[in-house]
UniProtKB/Swiss-Prot annotation:
It is found in: Membrane. This is UPF0494 membrane protein C977.06. The lineage of its organism: Eukaryota, Fungi, Dikarya, Ascomycota, Taphrinomycotina. Belongs to the UPF0494 family. Keywords: Membrane, Transmembrane, Transmembrane helix. Pfam families: DUF999. The keyword Membrane applies. It is a multi-pass membrane protein. The chain crosses the membrane at residues 78-98, 120-140, 148-168. One of its GO terms (cellular component) is membrane. InterPro entries: DUF999.
Length: 189
């Protein structure tokens, strides 16, 4: 007589799901711990990025303004602000791997000819817009802070970090908009 084995796997699965059969240690080791480790790695990466940013900002501030004062009338203000914006954009690319994220769009747009040009020009336009916004934000801050104590450099660095994080967030939102609404020019076939 042939035994019906259709429900054997289902019965075995239900048996393993019983509370007394679940091994909580294995659940933690196989599911929760890897996720926790990933979060810790990302947190360490962000801490390292912020530490580097604060260190570089302190060096920059001390070399340009040894007495701890920031002058809005300095002729070097514009070039320094532009250089800082470029450095922050590259720092975000280096630490958060935005470049690799953007390369996916570009590769896909060349593989599939029906995709929109926005996937190539979109990221470039986003970077330019973010660069201008960051520059305007820093100029606005420099107009408010005419003479500052050395401690104000920490506040300015914190504002720059918040803007940098916002830039990454805006990048992801713009990616979603480009994918869902297909802004841009159609590829002529």
């Amino acid at each position: 007589m042939v035994r019906d084995t259709r429900n054997v796997d289902l019965e075995r699965g239900l048996e393993l799901c019983k509370p007394e059969k679940v091994n909580k240690q294995n659940l933690f080791t196989n599911i929760i711990k890897p996720q926790k480790d990933k979060i810790n790695i990302k947190t360490d990466k962000i801490k390292f990025f912020l530490n580097n940013l604060f260190t570089e900002f302190s060096k920059f501030h001390d070399s340009c303004y040894p007495d701890g004062r920031i002058s809005t009338r300095s002729k070097l203000r514009w070039p320094l602000l532009i250089i800082w914006c470029i450095l922050i954009v590259f720092a975000i690319d280096k630490n958060f791997e935005v470049k690799d994220f953007l390369s996916i769009w570009i590769n896909e747009s060349f593989i599939n000819e029906n995709r929109f040009y926005s996937e190539i020009w979109g990221p470039i336009a986003i970077y330019i817009c973010l660069f201008v916004l960051l520059l305007l934000g820093l100029i606005y801050c420099s107009k408010i802070v005419v003479k500052a104590i050395p401690l104000i450099s920490i506040v300015i660095a914190a504002v720059v970090v918040i803007i940098a994080v916002a830039m990454v967030k805006i990048l992801y939102i713009c990616h979603w908009l480009l994918q869902n609404f297909n802004f841009g020019f159609r590829h002529k076939s």
